Amino acid sequence: MFQDNPLLAQLKQQLHSQTPRAEGVVKATEKGFGFLEVDAQKSYFIPPPQMKKVMHGDRIIAVIHSEKERESAEPEELVEPFLTRFVGKVQGKNDRLTIVPDHPLLKDAIPCRAARGLNHEFKEGDWAVAEMRRHPLKGDRSFYAELTQYITFGDDHFVPWWVTLARHNLEKEAPDGVATEMLDEGLVREDLTSLDFVTIDSASTEDMDDALFAKALPDDKLQLIVAIADPTAWIAEGSKLDKAAKIRAFTNYLPGFNIPMLPRELSDDLCSLRANEVRPVLACRMTLSADGTIEDNIEFFAATIESKAKLVYDQVSDWLENTGDWKPESEAIAEQVRLLAQICQRRGEWRHNHALVFKDRPDYRFILGEKGEVLDIVAEPRRIANRIVEEAMIAANICAARVLRDKLGFGIYNVHMGFDPANADALAALLKTHGLHVDAEEVLTLDGFCKLRRELDAQPTGFLDSRIRRFQSFAEISSEPGPHFGLGLEAYATWTSPIRKYGDMINHRLLKAVIKGETATRPQDEITVQMAERRRLNRMAERDVGDWLYARFLKDKAGTGTRFAAEIVDISRGGMRVRLVDNGAIAFIPAPFLHAVRDELVCSQENGTVQIKGETVYKVTDVIDVTIAEVRMETRSIIARPVA
C-alpha cells in the first residue's frame, strides 16, 4: 500500500535533508571510541559500535544525533578512505590470514588473502604490501584487503629498509643497464689533465662528482675551476637509462646504504672522478676578487681532467687545523688545499655580508654491523673541509643560475620565496611583541628577508627564529628563474651533482647547449613535479628508517638512568618533542611527565612554551636533560622524561 507512495518518498527526503550532518576526519583512540574532527575547534563523539564501520583517518560524512544535550556521530558515507595501499604484518596462516597495518593508530587485524598470481605462501610475521578491497561504508559487510606484494620475513635484520622502501613504493636496487661508449656530442673538450685537481669527500664515498682546482692571480684575485662528472656524455636524452633516472629523480641516501639514480657502473666508476683516472667533465671557470665577489667573466666549458688526489674531509680539516698525522702527499696538493681554504674564507665572508649563511648543524651517521644492527650513532660536525666543498659548490651553482637565466631564460632552479605574503602582518605583529620592528611589505623582499635573518642570527637564542619558521613558504623546484630567500640569492640552479640528481643532469644538457650556441627546450612542468614528489618520498623514507634504527639503538636505555642532553624542537597540547643532541633521535615527552596537575599546566604550540602555574618553565630551543622512559618498537617511538 505504501510502495511507490510519492508522499512517503517526499517525507523521507525531507527527514533526510533536515537531519544534521557533518564532514570530517575520524580520529581513533585506544579505548574503542573515536571522534569525528570537523575542524580545529569542533569534533563529535563516535561510539564504539559505530567505530567498527570506519578506520582512523577516514574522511567521512556522518549523521549527527543529539540526545540529552550530548551529540554523537553516526558514519554514513565514505568521502576518502585513509587506507588504500599500505604495508603491514601478516597474522594466521594459509586460508585464514589477516594483516595489521604498520601504523601507530591502526591496531585491528584486517582479513585478507593473497592476490592471484602472487607466488608466496604467507605465514605469521611476514611483511606484505596490501590494498584495501572492501569497506563497510561502501556497502560491504566488513573491511577486506588483498596482499599484492611479499616484502620479507619477520626476523629479517633488514626489515627497516625493505619495509620502508615498499611503503613509499621506492626502488630497492640500482637501475639495470650499461653505457658502453661516450656519445658524440659535438663538444670540444679542453685538456686539463695536467692540472692538480683534487676531490674532497667522505672516506667511503665512491660516487665522486666534483673536483676542484684553484690558482692565485695578480691583484689578489683567485681563480677557481669546478669540474663536475659528466653522465650526460654517456646517457642520451630519452634513452632507457635516462628514463629510469627521470623516474628516480635522485639517488636515495638511507642510513647504511644508498640506492643510486644511475647504474653503479656509471655512478661509482665511469663517471666518478677517481684519483689518477682520466674523466670527461663539465667545468666552470670563475674569478674571485679580493672580497670574494664572483666576477662577470664566468666560463662554462667541456674538458677532460685527471684528479690527482682523493682527499678525505676529516684529514683535510685536521691538517688545516694543525692536528692529526695526515699530510698532503705533495707540495702541489698542499698548495691546492691552502688556496681552496682561502677561497672558502672569501666566499664565506661574501655570503655573510651579501647573502645568508646557514647555521652549522652536525650530520648524524649510523654505524651499522653486518646484520643491520646499530653499533653507534655519531655526530659529524661540519668542519673546514666540508665548508670548502660547500662554498665551491654554491659559487658554481650561482654561476650556472646566472648563465642559464641570461642565455636561455630557463633551467632547473631551486626557488624559495621566503615568507608567505598572507602571513606578513601576523609575522610583523609577532616580532613586535619581541621588540623587533619590521615592515610587513619590506620583509617580503629579498633584502628585507636577509636583513631580518641577520637580526635573528644576532639574537642570544634561536627561540624567536623557531617561532617564525611556520610563516615561511617551502622551497620549490621551478623551470623559471627566481630568488632563493633561504640562501639570500637572486637565483640558484644546481648542476654539481648530476650522478645523484636528475635536475642537475638537465642543467648539464642546457649548459652544453649554451656552450655550443644551440637552442634548447624549456623543461616541462611534469619533470619538476616528479622531482619534488621524489624528494618528499626520499626524505620520508630516510626519516622512517632513521626512526626504526633510533628505536633499536635506544631500546636498552629505556628505564635506565642514562641521561641525554635534548633540545626542545616542538611543543603541542599533548607534550614536547625533543631532539637528543648527541645522536639526533627525536623523542616525545608526554604532558603528564612535565607536571602532575593538568589544570596547572599550559602547553602552547602558538607561543612555543610550557607554563606551570603561570610561570614559563620550558620553551622551544631550550636544552634539557632527559632519560628514556620507554621505547615502543611497534610504533618506533621513543618516550622520554625530563630529569627532575
Curated annotation (Swiss-Prot):
It is an enzyme of class 3 (hydrolase). One of its GO terms (biological process) is mRNA catabolic process. Involved in mRNA degradation. Hydrolyzes single-stranded polyribonucleotides processively in the 3' to 5' direction. Signal peptide: none annotated. It holds the Pfam family S1. One of its GO terms (molecular function) is RNA binding. NCBIfam families: 3_prime_RNase, PRK05054.1, RNase_B. Transmembrane segments: none annotated. Its main location: cytoplasm. InterPro entries: CSD, NA-bd_OB-fold, RNase_B_OB_dom, RNase_II, RNase_II/R, RNase_II/R_CS, RNase_II/RNase_R, RNR_Ribonuclease. SUPFAM superfamilies: Nucleic acid-binding proteins. Its EC number is 3.1.13.1. GO terms for cellular component: cytosol. It catalyses: Exonucleolytic cleavage in the 3'- to 5'-direction to yield nucleoside 5'-phosphates. Keywords: Cytoplasm, Exonuclease, Hydrolase, Nuclease, RNA-binding. This is Exoribonuclease 2. It is found in: Cytoplasm. Residues 189-516 form the RNB domain. Residues 561-643 form the S1 motif domain. Belongs to the RNR ribonuclease family. RNase II subfamily.
